[in-house]
């Protein structure tokens, strides 16, 4: 790999390490609430090793190595470097790598799925390892995987048969995408939900589905049979269920939730925790699904939580979930504003560009809250969440939206933002946080929350008039496709689904944010149109920041595989293309001050005409969004793929010219140092916070001895 190619994989130096500030919100809880939050926090973080195993085979050993080195020198890294003969600069490089590693819970970026490697030379890491026998033993297990791979494809997560890395299919280097697809369809047919599974291909060519559970023989199972003979191209082979994947961790999680249940604050929480315990002890996704039914009924709790194998972005097939869990406190002041948005939703949704037949018969008002996060376990912390992901619960029972306030407000050092014109920097700095809050609210509440899937819910039963089907607004013809019995949005759209849905939700936000009555709900303006007032500034930055995100997205596109590595960023690139194609010079990219096409792109800037948002920007978004939505609603995968591939295609100018400049100017993503809680005898629960530094990040995990 040449130096230029290698540079994009080097660990951030320095990483942007910030505190997830929580103290005043935690201290406002009473003793019972603190204990409830404490045990949920511990349950969530007890899954850390699951996250590590879900990233790469070497991640768990690297994690242990970082903590072992810290313990061996009692956190005095300068002394460790001196005794190992390693310079202070190289020790700093190791600490920078360690902070990014722990912040991503593995050695592939949680946002982008590309590997990052230390800047410290390998012989210096070996020297650090030699200072401690346990560290040296660990080092020998991962030293060949710490740095760049000989095959560039292995620098990215993805399907093994495409040369990429995926530990959702452990010890199975020759497993094919067709085999993954075939077995996924079989499991769906048998009624086994795949979120809490991994799959291994054995040397004999048979398949083992590894189910996460605290026991190897659960008292009850979601499906009766555990062994299946295969047919078709795999005749003679078999598939069997193997319980007890992540057994130690699942037992710890179940034990902590058993303790949390003792402090549940109402009956919904009591029932929810009971289902969580069954889900993780027995490996039951059916129980997890039931936990979410109780969770959505627990409206506006003082202590909010969710936990499980939730998001499926990182499984290349898009069906297996990553471990995730959080404990958080409600921010009542911010939640009031979001509550008004929820109440106004029935008036806002009809403004979207599709007929009523493509919308739910009744909007299920979600619980929309702003949270201050105590703990978020997983590979990265989002700014907002819309769950559960189970289609039938979302369609028929409801869902919750949460905005993570202290994630949104976590401050990084102020500096000029790449690709923004000098004359836009001040308004961008002033409005980027409010604009992002508007975007997150609309994205999560109305974006993910709106829309109907046209379904044959069971043989011969439909959730629309099949005798007189609605007109497809894209084709002008009657609808001719829909979801068949047993099909879900995820099963039909597969690996493309997560990015496509994020694009749909982002587009809903772009469609609705030009509505000044909505901006007023968030506290901007009086509802009257004024593109040059405060509300107009927020609207302008909603659009400008989306265009900028589309350029920045190229960092997450791999030129070798020509593959997107991050669902949200692929979506934002598509929306930037919508802006660029809107016409009328609404949005243009200027290569240099004199617009010289042959200039280097160090002065590349976005020109977006705020006055043309209502005349060019929003109409272009609406036309794009209508197609996205209708293709999803009608299960039209072929049309959706052709359409989405067009907008997410990276041409040679973006690949060869723009992308290298994006990488050169890229700012490190934040990694968050989170507090710990400890039971303190009769004094209740102690909250311990740490400094925002690589050393503080490592210390916070060293003190989680239960992991």
Segments predicted by a language model, with ranges:
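Mature N-terminal segment immediately following signal peptide/propeptide cleavage
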Residues: 14-42
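Contiguous, non-catalytic segments that form substrate-binding/exosite surfaces or channel walls
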Residues: 95-98, 102-218, 225, 236-436
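Eukaryotic N-terminal low-complexity, Ser/Thr- and Lys/Arg-rich leader segments
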Residues: 1-8
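Short active-site segment of divalent metal-dependent hydrolases/proteases
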Residues: 442, 446-447
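Short amphipathic alpha-helical segments at helix boundaries and their inter-helical linkers
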Residues: 41-56, 278-291
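Solvent-exposed, polar/charged alpha-helical surfaces in well-ordered, non-transmembrane soluble domains
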Residues: 27, 34-39, 60, 64, ...
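Zinc-dependent metallohydrolase catalytic domains
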Residues: 8-11, 33, 42-43, 49-119, ...
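Soluble non-cytosolic domains of exported or imported proteins
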Residues: 16, 27, 31, 56, ...
């Amino acid at each position: 790999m040449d130096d230029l190619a290698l540079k994009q994989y080097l660990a951030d130096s320095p990483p942007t390490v910030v505190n997830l500030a929580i103290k005043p919100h935690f201290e406002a809880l009473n003793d019972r609430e603190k204990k409830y939050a404490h045990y949920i926090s511990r349950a969530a973080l007890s899954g850390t090793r699951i996250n590590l195993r879900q990233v790469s085979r070497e991640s768990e050993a690297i994690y242990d190595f970082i903590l072992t080195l810290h313990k061996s020198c009692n956190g005095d890294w300068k002394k460790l470097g001196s005794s190992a003969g390693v310079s202070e600069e190289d020790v700093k490089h190791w600490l920078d790598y360690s902070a990014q590693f722990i912040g991503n819970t593995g050695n592939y970026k949680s946002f982008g799925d590309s590997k990052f490697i230390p800047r410290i030379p390998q012989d210096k890491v070996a020297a650090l390892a030699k200072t401690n026998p346990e560290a040296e033993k660990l080092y020998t297990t991962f030293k060949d995987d710490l740095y760049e791979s000989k095959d560039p494809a292995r620098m990215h997560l993805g399907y093994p048969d495409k040369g990429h890395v995926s530990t959702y299919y452990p010890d199975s280097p020759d497993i094919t995408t067709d085999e993954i697809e075939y077995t996924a369809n079989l499991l769906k047919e048998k009624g086994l939900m795949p979120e809490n599974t991994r799959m291994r291909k054995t040397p004999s060519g048979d398949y083992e589905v590894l189910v996460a559970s605290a026991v190897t023989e659960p008292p009850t199972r979601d499906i009766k049979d555990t062994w299946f003979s295969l047919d078709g191209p795999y005749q003679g082979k078999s598939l069997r269920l193997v319980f007890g994947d992540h057994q130690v961790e699942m037992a710890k999680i179940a034990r902590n939730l058993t303790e949390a249940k003792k402090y549940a604050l109402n009956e919904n929480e009591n029932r929810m925790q009971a289902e969580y315990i069954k889900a993780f002890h027995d490996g039951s996704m059916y129980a997890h699904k039931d936990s979410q039914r109780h969770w959505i009924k627990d409206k506006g709790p003082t202590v909010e939580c969710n936990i499980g194998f939730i998001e499926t972005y990182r499984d290349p097939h898009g069906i297996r979930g990553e471990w995730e869990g959080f404990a958080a406190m409600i921010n009542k002041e911010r939640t009031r504003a979001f509550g008004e948005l929820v109440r106004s939703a029935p008036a806002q949704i009809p403004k979207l560009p599709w007929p009523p037949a493509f919308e739910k018969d009744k909007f299920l008002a979600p619980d929309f809250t702003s949270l201050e996060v105590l703990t978020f376990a997983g590979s990265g912390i989002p700014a907002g969440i819309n769950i559960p992901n189970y289609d039938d619960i979302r369609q028929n029972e409801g869902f919750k939206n949460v905005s993570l306030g202290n994630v949104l407000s976590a401050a990084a050092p102020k500096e000029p933002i790449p690709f923004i014109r000098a004359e836009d920097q001040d308004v961008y700095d002033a409005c980027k946080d409010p604009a992002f809050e508007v975007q997150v609210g609309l994205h999560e509440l109305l974006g993910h929350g709106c829309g109907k899937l046209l379904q044959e819910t069971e043989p011969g039963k439909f959730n629309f008039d099949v005798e007189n089907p609605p007109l497809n607004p894209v084709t002008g013809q009657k609808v001719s496709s829909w979801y068949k019995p047993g099909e879900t949005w995820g099963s039909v759209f597969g690996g493309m689904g997560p990015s496509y849905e994020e694009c749909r939700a982002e587009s809903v936000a772009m469609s609705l944010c030009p509505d000044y009555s909505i901006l007023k709900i968030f506290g901007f303006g009086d509802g009257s149109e004024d593109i040059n007032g405060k509300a107009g500034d927020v609207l302008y930055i909603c659009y400008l920041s989306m265009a900028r995100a589309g350029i920045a997205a190229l960092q997450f596109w791999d030129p070798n595989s020509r593959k997107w590595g991050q669902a949200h960023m692929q979506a934002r690139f598509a929306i930037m293309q919508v802006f660029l194609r809107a016409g009328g010079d609404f949005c243009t990219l200027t290569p240099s001050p004199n617009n010289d096409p042959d200039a280097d792109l160090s002065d590349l800037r976005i020109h977006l005409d705020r006055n043309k948002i209502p005349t060019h920007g929003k109409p272009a978004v609406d036309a794009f969004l209508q197609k996205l939505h209708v293709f999803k609603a009608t299960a039209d995968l072929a049309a959706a793929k052709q359409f989405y591939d067009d907008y997410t295609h990276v041409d040679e100018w973006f690949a060869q010219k723009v992308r290298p400049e994006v990488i050169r100017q890229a700012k490190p993503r934040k990694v968050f140092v989170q507090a710990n809680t400890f039971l303190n005898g009769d004094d209740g629960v102690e909250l311990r916070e740490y400094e925002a530094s690589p050393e503080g990040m490592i210390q916070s995990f060293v003190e989680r001895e239960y992991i």
